[in-house]
Amino acid sequence: MARPRRSDSDGNAPRRPSAGAGPVIVDDYANLSGESLLKKTLGLQNHRYAKYIGPTDEHDFALLDLRLYDDLRNEAPADLGSFRKVGPNEFFHQYADADSPSHAGEVEVLDRIERIVAPHGEALIRLYFRIVHPSFPILHKKVYLEKYGRTHREFSPPLLAAVYILALNWWSYSSELARSAKPDVAQLEDIAYNTLQDVSQRAKLSTVQAGLLLLQRPGSNQAWQLTSQLVAIGQDLGLHLDCTNWRIPSWEKGLRKRLAWALFMQDTWSALIYGRPPHISETNWAVQPVIGSDFPESAADEDEEEGSTEVEKGRTLFSAMIALTKMLAQVLEDLYSLKAETQVKNSYDTTKAILERAKPIQLKLRSWYADMPEALRMDATRVGKLSSVGYLHLAYFATEITLHRRILRSLSHNTDPYLIQICRSAAKARLISAMDFFNRLKPEHLQSFWYFASKFNFALIGTFAGLCFVTSVSHDEAEFYQRRLLEYRWTLRVSNKSAEFLEIASGILESAVGSLLKAADSIDSRGFSFPMLQPHAEDGDTSMEHQNFSPSAEFGYYDDQMEP
């Protein structure tokens, strides 16, 4: 049974001006009467935007430090705009939005967005904070509701549209909305993507927020290009820096950290998906780990309406995903970067070199999985609550698969058969576990928020099965992998009506392995050519037996299947 809507005083429902009152126009948040979280904000100012001044900029820190900064705002006038000092060597150049030609007509665009969703704007915002926000906390709920309570015209158009777009995915989960006709999401998407390019010229934190939310859409296009753009914007905003001691509101410090790590995750998972080098590197990344105080909401803020997401579980999930993504970044750097490829090629033994690099990451992954909080286990579901933990477990399997994918690629006819057996057995265990995971998904998992990479990660399981298939060392093994791949493809196909992203995942998988399976089906499976298949595998030839091979103890952990 749905709980009655909370009163405005608890910050859970937006306060709007009465029908006869005009919207409150806020030129500068510092001039707001009464209490406001936004009074000293750096990254979400109204009618102004701020760009970080880097260490090699024409405005040298020593020269900037000589300027007179007022005590209230830590600002000093500039020839154009103003400078703001937030730390000993951290300065921002602030400009007026009006100086940008793209600013004209923004109010009309915001009004158009509201007309598209009218009269359901408030209900959609409640729906977004019920289902999406707990598992992907890149907004500040009270700040968002404070602004919306005054007027929708305080928002950046792409952010306002993006929140509505994602909320529309759960339209039927609101008893208030389910009885009404659904707004045209295509119109909202057109506005969101077009205005995102406009506001990128005068970017704020809301620009990155909008971009990240749009990238969570199941059918988002040009994701790599947009991700690249968001990383550049994030650097303009100083998101790559440690803001712990900056002179900005404490809520904004937490928001910046959450947003920075969300950007890091977007960049890393996009790099995996599209086979590109990540833009963000450890060398120029000073963001501190998120801690409890960086998340302003708690269980007390949780919505009790059926079909909501648990707030504290979402916070734990987000933190765990950050930790996992750091390990994925290490996999990409140590096993797939151009530098790593060159070093491995120049090594005496390619497989041994790969295993040496993989071992410490594998141990970290095993420890991460073993130490996973109970709240994030697949069976830790509550009646009437959606659970997004599925995307975390899927991301774990994708990371494991990416690691073992590189190991399998290193194997050749010259690799000792015993080492081949060890490596392939470990890869097989990961594949079976990943496929079994899919069968454990419940409706409360499938209907929740899923991270953008999930559709690709589901397809990656099938791609890995295809790799195991074509690198098989015996016909029996080849038939096993062919059968499992066919079963997985079928299961994904018949399940794709459960969620939109599964339908997309099914299409991605078909593109990746459809031709392979068609070719394998068109001929006798024992006549199919496998590069790793040795002639002696069928006739019992023992010429390559491993009687003189003694794998070093450092690779012994591969004997442990480490099934989750």
Predicted features, each with a name:
Residues 279-304:
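Short, flexible helix-coil linker/hinge segments at the edges of structured domains or between repeats
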